[in-house]
A protein has these predicted regions:
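Bacterial N-terminal signal peptides that target proteins for export
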Residues: 4-20
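Hydrophobic core
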Residues: 21-31
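Boundary at the C-terminal end of the N-terminal hydrophobic targeting segment
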Residues: 34-37
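Extracellular disulfide-bonded cysteine-rich modules/repeats
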Residues: 56-64
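Non-catalytic C-terminal accessory/binding modules of secreted extracellular proteins
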Residues: 78-84, 91, 97-103, 248-270, ...
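Zn2+-dependent metallopeptidase catalytic core
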Residues: 82-275, 284, 379, 466-472, ...
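Extracellular hydrolytic enzyme modules, especially secreted metalloproteases
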Residues: 86, 224, 229, 237-383
């Protein structure tokens, strides 16, 4: 969000209607010719998505519309909270329980896809404590001040958790001012190739043995019993530690044992230009008990599966963690559905209002409709981006990360609109190739990326499961109509 655009919460006193009218008349009458000409561009065609024309109290922004059009949208510089739409049913009616009958084995067997989550190492409701350790090695010396870097990242983690949990969870994160030197050499350790195998690849420590080796160094300075997990951030020079490690386990240490999270930040994420805080939040959400990784399909609509677009949490996962408040969800069962128009708040923005529309289709399926924007928690979206996504949740399906995303391998999937024919979004994309020995090549390329038929622009409709979903009007928020399909 640019610095000249502000979010005004409802607690701020609004100007009287009469004063607003008088002010508007004075402003318009005093506008120079150029400003009047710009005002007339609203709804007219434009060339570059994200282009802005600044006005006195508002601005024009070039955005997509239906039929591939690019037009100017008029947007105010102040964004106010919205009153939530009155939900026909309690949101708990759409909070379907898990209904998996034949559970798959693997790391994802102990995480949850629905409410209530089975708590892992972090409590999704209440207070938690964590230890961040910037760690370096004699053969991979750390550079710079880890305290300076972590201060910024930890602040972001606190802000994200406070907003998306509605203040229902907190984490106290401790970290040292300088690098902690490991007794091991980086060349003795590896996070490659297969962390799921208990045995170490070659003569290097990996997996549980790797975490235990690093915990032994930490235990000399910190009382591990005070923490629910330790997150290691290796020096960038430690090239053998380029892949993340995510383990919730009981680890052996020289002083006994430690039960909790043992994570290693995949420092190749710096090459991918990922935010450190977002990478860690994703891991924390697993530790709260979430399966994540659905809906995904390489679409940039949430921290559950990507760190390249919107970095908010979708309302289904929010609800599964017990973070949802009354008014956050417009819930209705399909048999009770009547035509309605609901104003949605983008999940990437800190704005009060209705966050999601949910339509219960059966005892195991629910449609979820959400709005997206480039905003505080979505700054990796391109300027001018907006849209409404729809995904289907099926609580009888367990994630199977060994197979491509589909209705039978993911509990949630975004729905593609077969009635539109948009281009793929052209954007920078990171690529990497790794051979059998773990040697990596990587870089960036600008090319068509994800399919924009997975989102609705203004005046577009999607028909699915007997429901018609239309984005009637868009601005700072999205006015969505839901009705039975004819």
């Amino acid at each position: 969000m640019s610095q000249d655009i502000h979010l005004r919460h409802s607690s701020i006193r609004k100007s009287s209607k009469a004063l607003a009218v008088i002010t508007a008349i004075l402003l318009v009458s005093g506008l120079p010719d150029a400003a009047v000409a710009n005002e007339k561009k609203v709804g007219k065609s434009c060339n570059k998505i994200g282009e802005r024309i600044n006005l006195k109290e508002s601005y024009l922004e070039c955005r997509w519309k239906s039929e591939g059009k690019k037009v100017y949208f008029l947007l105010t510089k102040i964004i106010e909270d919205l009153n939530p739409s009155i939900s026909p049913e309690p949101y708990t009616n759409c909070r379907l329980p898990e209904a998996i009958k034949n559970r798959l084995d693997g790391w994802n067997s102990y995480v949850s896809i629905a409410y209530p989550v089975v708590k892992s190492t972090l409590d999704p409701l209440g207070s938690n404590t964590y230890l961040f350790i910037p760690i370096d090695f004699k053969d991979a010396v750390g550079v710079g001040s880890p305290e300076k870097m972590l201060r910024t990242e930890v602040k972001k983690i606190y802000e994200w958790l406070d907003w998306y949990s509605n203040g229902k969870v907190s984490i106290q994160i401790d970290y040292p001012k300088s690098w902690l030197r490991s007794s091991k050499l980086a060349s003795e350790l590896t996070t490659w190739p297969d962390l799921a195998k208990p045995s170490s690849p070659g003569d290097k420590l990996s997996g549980i043995s790797l975490v235990e080796a690093l915990l032994a160094d930490v235990e000399q300075t910190y009382d591990l019993s005070k923490y629910q997990g330790v997150y290691f951030l290796p020096s960038l020079a430690a090239k053998s530690l380029e892949h993340g490690v995510f383990l919730n386990n009981t680890f052996k240490t020289p002083k006994g044992s430690f039960t909790g999270g043992g994570y290693i930040y995949g420092n190749s994420a710096f090459e991918r230009e990922e935010f450190v805080w977002a990478f860690i939040i994703h891991d924390f959400l697993h530790s709260f008990g979430l399966a994540l990784h659905a809906p995904g399909q390489e679409l940039p609509f949430g921290i559950q599966d990507t760190t390249f677009g919107g970095l908010g949490i979708n309302e289904w996962d929010t609800m599964s963690l017990g973070w949802t408040n009354d008014g956050d969800v417009y819930c209705v069962s399909k048999e009770n559905l009547k035509t309605a128009e609901i104003q949605l708040v983008p999940i990437e923005r800190e704005q009060k209002g209705t966050q999601s529309i949910m339509i219960k289709l059966s005892d195991t399926q629910v449609l979820v409709i959400e709005s997206h924007r480039r905003d505080k928690w979505g700054m990796k979206f391109l300027p001018g981006f907006y849209g409404v996504s729809t995904y289907l949740v099926d609580t009888s399906v367990q994630n199977d990360p060994t197979k491509p995303a589909s209705k039978s391998t993911r509990f949630a999937n975004y729905i593609k609109n077969t009635q539109t024919n948009k281009d793929r979004l052209v954007n920078r994309r990171y690529w990497q190739e790794t051979d059998a020995k773990g040697n990596r090549k990587s870089g960036w390329v600008t090319q068509p990326t994800w399919d924009m038929d997975y989102i609705l622009f203004e005046n577009e409709s999607l028909v699915t499961n007997g429901i018609k979903i239309t984005l009637k009007k868009s601005g700072h928020n999205d006015l969505v109509r839901i009705e039975r399909a004819q």
